[in-house]
């Protein structure tokens, strides 16, 4: 890892800005080879998000993870160690959805990152499958979310965490979030369980049966479930069109 990048990650984690997987456990190293750690520089300062490799040259993440400079780490387990499996690639282009709405009305919260160089496939780095544009994930589906960061309000971790979450009915989130949109968002996490994804886990994938169906978008300020995820299936035409258009522009 470049010394400056490692120092920035160390400072970020000292400030506890990395977010939360609540009620989960440590993932087996490299069991989620599509996971990406994003270090983002913006006028507001340094922040982190999750993301996931969808092709050797593209990472998908949340639209609100935008910044003037983004560094991507692939193949990581402990984000504060210089692991031999890690690949560090800068972002050539960050393409946020043209209809993205910032908080408080978060809509179309999705962004493609074109990498400056292609990722090398290995046991620790592999793309995840994307859904068919016509196939909708159903309530009751048991899915996995992974991310780095806090595991409770005050306790942090540097290693990748994972949690299994169940897709809820749209009404469950419509009752809690004023701007929930069932066409472009998924309601995830049983309100009766203390399991959720939160804050800096933003941009990470909801993976159901080995297919990325959602992107961590937002939730309640307390971190209690359910949380709202961007529905990838609704954006497949835009994703395919954008990757096709940019592939010839290296």
Curated annotation (Swiss-Prot):
InterPro entries: Peptidase_S1_PA, Peptidase_S1_PA_chymotrypsin, Peptidase_S1A, Trypsin_dom, TRYPSIN_HIS, TRYPSIN_SER. GO terms for molecular function: caspase binding; heparin binding; peptidase activity; receptor ligand activity; serine-type endopeptidase activity; serine-type peptidase activity. It is found in: Cell membrane; Cytoplasmic granule; Secreted; Cytoplasm, Cytosol. Glycans are attached at residue 71. Pfam families: Trypsin. The active site is at residues 64, 109, 202. GO terms for cellular component: cytoplasmic stress granule; cytosol; extracellular space; lysosome; membrane; nucleus; plasma membrane; secretory granule. The keyword DNA-binding does not apply. Keywords: Antibiotic, Antimicrobial, Cell membrane, Chemotaxis, Cytoplasm, Disulfide bond, Glycoprotein, Hydrolase, Lysosome, Membrane, Nucleus, Protease, Secreted, Serine protease, Signal, Zymogen. Belongs to the peptidase S1 family. This is Cathepsin G. The gene is Ctsg.
């Amino acid at each position: 890892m470049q010394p400056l990048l490692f120092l920035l990650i160390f400072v970020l984690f000292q400030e506890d800005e990395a977010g939360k997987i609540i009620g989960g456990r440590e993932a087996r190293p490299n069991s989620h080879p599509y996971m990406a750690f994003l270090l983002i520089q913006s006028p507001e300062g340094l922040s982190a998000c999750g993301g996931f490799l969808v092709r050797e040259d593209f990472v998908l993440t949340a639209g609100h993870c935008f910044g003037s400079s983004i560094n991507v780490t692939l193949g990581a387990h402990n984000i504060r160690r210089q692991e031999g499996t890690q690949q560090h690639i800068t972002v050539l282009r960050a393409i946020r959805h043209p209809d993205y709405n910032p908080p408080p009305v978060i809509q179309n919260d999705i962004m493609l990152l074109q990498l400056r160089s292609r990722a090398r496939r290995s046991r620790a780095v592999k793309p995840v499958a994307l859904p068919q544009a016509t196939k909708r994930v159903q309530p009751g589906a048991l899915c996995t979310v992974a991310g780095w960061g806090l595991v409770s309000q005050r306790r942090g971790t540097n290693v990748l965490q994972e949690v299994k979450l169940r897709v809820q009915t749209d009404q469950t989130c419509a009752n809690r979030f004023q701007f929930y949109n069932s066409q472009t968002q998924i309601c995830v996490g049983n309100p009766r369980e203390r399991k959720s994804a939160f804050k800096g886990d933003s941009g990470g994938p909801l993976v159901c049966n080995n297919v990325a169906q959602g992107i961590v978008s937002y939730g309640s300020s307390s971190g209690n479930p359910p949380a709202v995820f961007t529905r990838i299936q609704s954006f497949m035409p835009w994703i395919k069109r954008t990757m096709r258009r940019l592939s010839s522009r290296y």
